[in-house]
Amino acid sequence: METARVLVAADKFKGSLTAVQVAERVTAGLRRVVPGVRVETLPVADGGDGTVAAAVAAGFERREARVTGPLGDPVTAAYALRGSTAVVEMAEASGLQHLPDGVFAPLTATTYGSGELLLAALGAGATTIVFGVGGSATTDGGAGMLAALGARFLDADGKPVGPGGGPLAELAEADLSGLDPRLADIDLVLASDVDNPLTGPKGAPEVYGRQKGASEEDIAVLDAALAHYASILGPDQAALPGAGAAGGIGYGALVALGARFRPGIEVMLDVLGFAPALARATLVITGEGSLDEQTLHGKAPAGVAAAARAAGIEVVAVCGRLALPPEALEKAGIRRAYALAELEPDPAVSMAQAGPLLERAAESIAWDFLLR
């Protein structure tokens, strides 16, 4: 099919391939079968880790800043800038990747560095900031972030409370008067695939605390501490969608920074220029490491497929592992999915050989959809 124009808009395969590498491998596989096929690549992300990399691949400039990591030590964090729009990924400053293997600090990990990263974007002239939240090592309700931006959180003796979510149980006063005045003049968009509230059975500690090393006792402590924190800052916002994102940093951004919440993939498709790229395509290839129930709830492939289906463009997906029945794929707008596990059932081998296997999957797509 000489007129075929393929848009590759896939997320990363976590632990094996970045979104950029996925696009490269899919392109190579397609061209092995149809050398002249026109392929446009647009690596995507949903606001979690990989969001800055996707923006850079779309033409944003990569910037770096030295900030405070989740354990209090300095780390280098990247953000992306194009004109007056910045893409800031909280995981770059406060993510799990900054913790040594097996080391967690569920009660004391801080988002202070995320606030410093926002300051760097402000200093670079950003007036619109897309704040991607996900992959955090923290459950501090965004208190660390707000402290870096000029807020003060004091105990009953007028002393600053310690870092992390646990010490918020001692909070007596929250003073937001020192927040950087530039924050009042920007559009801060909270981009997340998580719409959980701050606390309760579906809140940040209960749903995500365990993956950050929290014990059952820690979860109870954090939930109570964040509820107390919210009672002082503003209890109404604690129930808003996205308040529980990234250990509650969503709440801090909503209650104190005037942020507006949008599903991460919707924001990123806008920022990355997906609509004009889609208009040029006759076939879309999306995907991520695992296509499962979570995919259907705000993950990148679901967002890409929904937009493509609305435009009447056929969508196929690539993945490492497929855990959705055909009817669920069809409902999501995905015509067919190609899983690396079908080519190599051993998960360890499949991850290690993800690149070559993905090229083989793309060859199959070319035979099935470009030469039919």
Give each language-model segment a name.
Residues 1-133, 137-372:
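N-terminal loops that bind phosphate or other acidic moieties
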